[in-house]
């Protein structure tokens, strides 16, 4: 996993996205979500541009979102196939992953 990845949250209330960036790269990876309620988000999409492929950005973004959920007492419904596949590989995420 790339330790230089930085993360941001763009939260517009009922929807938003988690953004990952690499130094020296103007592209952004994202994981978009909608908020079902105060303690439940639905992640519906993960996008990693070609310029970031193979650098562990998608996996790091998934782990970041899980960490965010734990810190905030939030659960995640992974409609996004990528996040669902990552959750299946990480049973230790079951405390925040629903479905």
List where the protein language model places each region.
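Conserved acetyl-CoA-binding loop-helix of GNAT-fold acetyltransferases
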Residues: 54-67
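C-terminal structural segments of small proteins and small subunits
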Residues: 64-99
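N-terminal first-folded block
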Residues: 2-40
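A short, internal acetyl-CoA/4′-phosphopantetheine-binding micro-motif in the GNAT/acyltransferase core
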Residues: 46-53
């Amino acid at each position: 996993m790339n330790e230089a990845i930085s993360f941001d949250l763009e939260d517009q209330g009922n929807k938003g996205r988690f953004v990952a960036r690499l130094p020296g790269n103007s592209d952004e990876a994202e994981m978009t979500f909608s908020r079902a309620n105060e303690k439940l988000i639905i992640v519906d999409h993960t996008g990693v541009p070609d310029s970031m492929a193979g650098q562990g950005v998608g996996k790091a973004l998934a782990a970041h979102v899980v960490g965010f959920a734990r810190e905030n007492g939030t659960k995640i419904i992974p409609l996004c196939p990528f996040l669902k596949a990552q959750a299946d590989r990480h049973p230790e995420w079951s405390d925040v992953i629903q479905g």
